[in-house]
From Swiss-Prot:
Spans through the membrane: none
A biological-process GO annotation: sporulation resulting in formation of a cellular spore
PANTHER family xref list: ANTI-SIGMA FACTOR ANTAGONIST TM_1081-RELATED, ANTI-SIGMA FACTOR ANTAGONIST TM_1081-RELATED-RELATED
Domain STAS, first and last residues per copy: 3-113
The protein's name: Anti-sigma F factor antagonist
Role description: In the phosphorylated form it could act as an anti-anti-sigma factor that counteracts SpoIIAB and thus releases sigma f from inhibition.
Post-translational modification: Phosphorylated by SpoIIAB on a serine residue.
Keywords for the protein's UniProt record, in alphabetical order: Phosphoprotein, Sporulation
Residues carrying Phosphoserine: 58
Molecular function as annotated in GO: anti-sigma factor antagonist activity; antisigma factor binding
Length: 116
């Protein structure tokens, strides 16, 4: 299975919607796409919608953590939303929810960032 990446810019927020599998085969493509979008659009915040993400491994966690650090340097925030139970468990085990906020829906996350 592959990874479909949908990126949408809303003011200074980049919405990232992932569908499929985020693993060592697809992580570099996501990293490059998101980094380019952040740099080209003056992005300060990320909303990561994982509702359609069926699988993620440590490579995926690494990409997400790297983008979190990139956004933090801009005094921004990353919000994960609409996460599947299996991927949520991986986030919990890795401790990422200690630094990255989880919201129920993309709409709610955008509202909290003032762009909905």
């Amino acid at each position: 299975m592959s990874l479909a990446i949908d990126l949408e810019v809303k003011k200074d927020v980049l919405c990232i919607r992932l569908q499929g599998e985020l693993d060592h085969h697809t992580a570099e493509s996501l990293r490059a796409s998101v980094t380019k979008a952040i740099e080209e659009n003056g992005i300060r915040h990320l909303v990561l919608n994982l509702e359609q993400l069926s699988f993620m491994d440590s490579s995926g966690l690494g990409v997400i953590l790297g983008r979190y650090k990139q956004i933090k340097q801009k005094n921004g925030e990353m919000i994960v939303c609409a996460i599947s139970p299996a991927v949520k468990r991986l986030f919990e085990l890795s401790g990422l929810f200690k630094i990255i906020r989880l919201d129920e829906s993309e709409q709610y996350a955008l509202h909290r960032l003032g762009v909905a």
